Structure formats: C-alpha cells, structure tokens
Design a protein with these regions (language model features):
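Catalytic cores and adjacent binding grooves of peptidoglycan-active enzymes
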Residues: 128, 133-136, 141-197
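Extracytoplasmic cell-surface/polysaccharide-interacting catalytic and binding patches
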Residues: 1-55, 100-103, 190-197
Length: 197
C-alpha cells in the first residue's frame, strides 16, 4: 500500500495551513491525514479564525472602561482613549497599558484541529468529537482574560453575521486555558460552557 503524504504548507486560508490544523504528537498508522470532506470543514472553521484574528487585532477599547482607564504613561496626564504619539516629553516614562488592543492581525495559535479516529482515541477524545470531522479547533490562550476575550469576539461574530457555531467551550486544566470552537456545516447547537478538565 502506497503511503499518502500531506502538503503541510498548503494554505486553508491566508493565515492557517493544513499542517497547523493537523499537527499531533501521536504517531499513527493513518498519519492523521484528512479526507477532502474534512479539509472542507477545516476551511469553514478557519474562516471564523481569520475573522477572530482580525477583530482581536483591531478591536477598539471597551467603552465600558472609557472613564476609568489607567494612564498610559507614568507621571503624565494622558487623555483616556488617546494613544500617545511617538514623540513623548522627556519627563514621561512608558508604562504597560492593560487596556490596549493587541497589534493588528494577532496570531491565533491552534493546539489541536483535525484528529483521525485513532489520534482522537489516543488523545482521550470521545468518538463523536467534532475534531474527528475537522469541525473543531482548540485555540491556545495566554490566560483566562484572553480566552474570555476570544469567546466574546466569536459570539459577536456569530450574532452580527447571523451565523451559528456548534460549540464554544472555555476550558481550563490547572493554569492552562484554551478555547474549543466548533462549526458544523449544519445542525449547529450553539453550545457554550465553561469546563475544568
């Protein structure tokens, strides 16, 4: 039987590759190589990820905190919501701005995407997992705040575009957080949950 190989660098969307969505630490006889139907599902999910990437990178600061933002500079009177210019008075020192939006096009890192049935079993997934059909990804998050922010953005995208998703699961194991996001071609359940695993 001829061994089938997968082009790891094949782009599903401008910022996501097939290799990135099929990577696994498990070595299996099937090579975790997706079918054409699975690739179509991965492309659908990656479309949402592209939108998340853009919105996470350019989202304006929340209006809720407009009047209570911390100063962007230590020892300087800086108007809330106004980003300082590159030329700064010498008596002002930069301080981290916890309310600042990330740079445009924030990288979205995928921990897990497609899993063949064998890889899914080794990973401890349930047989009916959306990962097996290529409909789900686990998005790496730097912490709870980023996980909640990504979830809120995905909910906004769903509401604003009138599209649905199947699962939006905010998951945590110890101090490690990730966001499980799934979109099916039909019969999406819009299941939202916080899970400690």
């Amino acid at each position: 039987m001829k061994q089938v190989e997968m082009n790891q660098n094949s782009r599903l969307t401008p910022h996501f590759t097939l290799g990135e969505l099929c990577k696994t630490k498990y070595v299996t006889a099937d090579g975790n190589i997706p079918s054409r139907a699975v690739i179509e599902n991965l492309i659908r999910v990656c479309g949402w990820l592209e939108e998340l990437r853009v919105v996470a990178g350019v989202r304006p600061r929340s209006k809720v905190f407009a009047g209570v933002r911390p100063q962007s500079k230590v020892g300087c009177a800086v108007d809330a919501g106004v980003r300082p210019q590159s030329k700064v008075a010498s008596d002002c020192t930069l301080a981290p701005d916890p309310w600042a939006a990330p740079e445009a096009g924030e990288a979205i890192v995928i921990n897990s995407g497609y899993r063949s049935p064998e890889v899914n079993r080794l990973a401890g997934g349930v047989p009916s997992s959306n990962h097996v059909t290529g409909c789900a990804v686990d998005i790496r998050c730097a912490g709870k705040e980023q996980m909640i922010r990504y979830a809120a953005i995905l909910l906004d995208i769903a509401d604003e575009t009138k599209r649905d998703f199947d699962e939006l699961l905010l998951e945590q194991h110890g101090s490690v957080c990730w966001l499980h996001f799934a979109v099916r071609s039909k019969d999406n359940r819009r299941k939202i949950a916080f899970l400690k695993v």
